[in-house]
Amino acid sequence: MESKIYKMELAGRELSFEIGKYALLANGAVLARYGDTAVLVTACASEKPREGINFFPLTVDYEERLYSVGKIPGGFIKREGKPSEKAILSARLIDRPIRPLFPKDFYHDVSVIATVLSVDPDNPPDVLAMLGSSVALSISDIPFEGPTGSVLVGYVDGKIVINPTAKEREVSKLHLVVSGTKDKVMMIEAGAQEIPEDIMLEAIMTAQEEIKKIVEFIEGIVKEVGKPKMQYEKRVVPEEIKQKVRELAYEKAYQYVQIPDKIERDKKLDELKEEVLKAFEGETEDTLLLVDDALYNLEKEIVRKMIAEEGKRPDGRKFDEIRPLYAEVGILPRTHGSALFKRGYTQVLTVATLGTKGEMQFLDGLEEEEAKRYMHHYNFPPYSTGESKPVRGPGRREIGHGALAERALEPVIPSEDEFPYTIRLVSEVLTSNGSTSQASVCGSTLALMDAGVPIKAPVAGISIGLITKEDGSFITLTDIQGIEDFFGDMDFKVAGTREGITAIQLDIKIHGLTKEIIEKALYQAREARLKILDFMQTVIDKPRSELSPYAPKIFKTTVDPEKIRDIIGPGGKMINKIIAKTNVKIDIEPDGRIFVAAPDDISGNRAISMIEGIGREIEVGQFFLGKVTRTASYGAFVEIYPGKEGLVHISQLDNKKLKSVDEVVKVGDLVLVKVIGIDRLGRIALSRKEALNVTYSRKAK
């Protein structure tokens, strides 16, 4: 195929797709460029479907290459290793809008790989990779009902900005990624500084207008170079199996899905499944898979009809009703802050830990090195769903949910000047029945307040579900539980304060959302969020006034940056001496800010005093109470501050003439001295004689 380049203007910059030159054996491949950012995206599919599965086997990988920013990987191996957290989140961004657009009966393995080749800070590669994935799939022979378009949206100086530059992103109150088809929204991912619902909706719809132009542009490319879509073997459930499953299961399934208690409901539905499969005993594995499909479709039909036509939810709640709430704080005595948050069966334990500045997380990826002083980690162990399987490291879903909760709380975390601690939150999902990520947002707020972190406002989260009808009408459901998420059309997670939204994550299973659905979901989420915040503030209404006795105490001082060298001392001698004497941790910033983490107030204040002493300017005429460190025939050396010594000449030790220094002082004595001179080399001359008639209280003044 002849190489072709297609170009369009997007937000004042050139967007281009080069096709037919790279990765020639892939089903679809494109080199996407935006400014100086370049990403190669490929799409490949297996020739045959994977056997024995009832899910779509799509994998998306986002490969960061450090050469794209002119860096060589650190460490001994000097090559890229496992994907970073940012790479995993970017892969999820690519995956979520395209997954619903594959045929439901397509079971071939599909692999989408985005390789970042060059990065321009003004043009983030993740959004470009999303566009590249849409092009690669659309021009390939893989069945795909796209194309999609994607943009980044900012809110700068009261204006909505499409694809903001690096400088604009620094001051933007909104970081919103929207993906969609020509007329509907497929995916939303947002972090915001308490943005009101009306502005958020305007930003989403402004993005949709740009997405429409992108999709029309990609459609033109597909008309020119797109391959015919492959024919594939469709797995269709025969009518006789459908009918038999319906006869065996309909009445019981209708009865069981309405059992309010999740444990009892799941038990009965599992028993029904066993009963149905037993009726097909002796059939092939392929037939049993079709039976499983038929039973799934039957249960889905019942739940959706029950909600849409009868106005009933499985647990009997109203459409806008939240499950029963329960919360408790301070449940773990030795942690710095802890909270248990429960919504229905969903139960999350969140623990807050306060650390020193030196415990921040340093990120060295495609962007400039960044230090994170606030982190949120989310764990989803197998027991939370009653399963027995090995515990592995965090998966993509756990990393994604942790990032969502982190983003939700970030706008209310106090600045380093207000609260000089590193903050780590860990949410342990103890029981899962829908909306665990939003429960972790609520639990995190409570744990921070229990830890005494002066957050700017409490944050709560809620998930809104959706049931669409054949006539185009729809029903939105507040606080969806597992069965509603499983059989519903969307999971629209919204977190925020009373003032506005701080985070959004939208996942859907249908071919997009209209403005009406998004607007209804945003305002329904706000109504629920305010109710949850009211409840949370009955548990703890404001951050505790004191930190846990087990949390480190952090003290802060500022010195002249030129004095940092003296505070550290040759080979770290001086700072290590302070640490050894006071049992503290010390972090020094290049601008002269110094943070001291101590086990108690006495140690912290002592360390600060020693540091300030070293950084202090000594002036002639000042008095100090110092310790004699050594003596010589010509005088005594007195340490007036850690690292600051002066000489009291023998003639300045006493009013009378002395034969020996030892007549008046010896090593270890505390003596009051006066500064009588400082030479050009910084050597300090002291006098005990001139301080003999001065009291210590006068010196303190």
From Swiss-Prot:
<feature type="domain" description="S1 motif">
    <location>
        <begin position="621"/>
        <end position="689"/>
    </location>
</feature>
<dbReference type="GO" id="GO:0006402">
    <property type="term" value="P:mRNA catabolic process"/>
</dbReference>
<dbReference type="InterPro" id="IPR015848">
    <property type="entry name" value="PNPase_PH_RNA-bd_bac/org-type"/>
</dbReference>
<comment type="similarity">
    <text>Belongs to the polyribonucleotide nucleotidyltransferase family.</text>
</comment>
<feature type="domain" description="KH">
    <location>
        <begin position="552"/>
        <end position="611"/>
    </location>
</feature>
<keyword id="KW-0694">RNA-binding</keyword>
<dbReference type="Pfam" id="PF03726">
    <property type="entry name" value="PNPase"/>
</dbReference>
<feature type="binding site">
    <location>
        <position position="485"/>
    </location>
    <ligand>
        <name>Mg(2+)</name>
    </ligand>
</feature>
<dbReference type="InterPro" id="IPR036612">
    <property type="entry name" value="KH_dom_type_1_sf"/>
</dbReference>
<keyword id="KW-0808">Transferase</keyword>
<dbReference type="GO" id="GO:0004654">
    <property type="term" value="F:polyribonucleotide nucleotidyltransferase activity"/>
</dbReference>
<dbReference type="InterPro" id="IPR036456">
    <property type="entry name" value="PNPase_PH_RNA-bd_sf"/>
</dbReference>
<keyword id="KW-0479">Metal-binding</keyword>
<dbReference type="InterPro" id="IPR004087">
    <property type="entry name" value="KH_dom"/>
</dbReference>
<dbReference type="Pfam" id="PF00575">
    <property type="entry name" value="S1"/>
</dbReference>
<dbReference type="GO" id="GO:0006396">
    <property type="term" value="P:RNA processing"/>
</dbReference>
<dbReference type="InterPro" id="IPR012162">
    <property type="entry name" value="PNPase"/>
</dbReference>
<dbReference type="InterPro" id="IPR027408">
    <property type="entry name" value="PNPase/RNase_PH_dom_sf"/>
</dbReference>
<keyword id="KW-0548">Nucleotidyltransferase</keyword>
<dbReference type="InterPro" id="IPR001247">
    <property type="entry name" value="ExoRNase_PH_dom1"/>
</dbReference>
<dbReference type="InterPro" id="IPR004088">
    <property type="entry name" value="KH_dom_type_1"/>
</dbReference>
<keyword id="KW-0460">Magnesium</keyword>
<protein>
    <recommendedName>
        <fullName>Polyribonucleotide nucleotidyltransferase</fullName>
        <ecNumber>2.7.7.8</ecNumber>
    </recommendedName>
</protein>
<dbReference type="InterPro" id="IPR015847">
    <property type="entry name" value="ExoRNase_PH_dom2"/>
</dbReference>
<feature type="binding site">
    <location>
        <position position="491"/>
    </location>
    <ligand>
        <name>Mg(2+)</name>
    </ligand>
</feature>
<dbReference type="InterPro" id="IPR036345">
    <property type="entry name" value="ExoRNase_PH_dom2_sf"/>
</dbReference>
<dbReference type="GO" id="GO:0005829">
    <property type="term" value="C:cytosol"/>
</dbReference>
<dbReference type="GO" id="GO:0003723">
    <property type="term" value="F:RNA binding"/>
</dbReference>
<dbReference type="Pfam" id="PF03725">
    <property type="entry name" value="RNase_PH_C"/>
</dbReference>
<dbReference type="InterPro" id="IPR020568">
    <property type="entry name" value="Ribosomal_Su5_D2-typ_SF"/>
</dbReference>
<dbReference type="InterPro" id="IPR003029">
    <property type="entry name" value="S1_domain"/>
</dbReference>
<dbReference type="Pfam" id="PF01138">
    <property type="entry name" value="RNase_PH"/>
</dbReference>
<keyword id="KW-0963">Cytoplasm</keyword>
<comment type="function">
    <text>Involved in mRNA degradation. Catalyzes the phosphorolysis of single-stranded polyribonucleotides processively in the 3'- to 5'-direction.</text>
</comment>
<dbReference type="InterPro" id="IPR012340">
    <property type="entry name" value="NA-bd_OB-fold"/>
</dbReference>
<dbReference type="Pfam" id="PF00013">
    <property type="entry name" value="KH_1"/>
</dbReference>
<dbReference type="GO" id="GO:0000175">
    <property type="term" value="F:3'-5'-RNA exonuclease activity"/>
</dbReference>
<dbReference type="GO" id="GO:0000287">
    <property type="term" value="F:magnesium ion binding"/>
</dbReference>
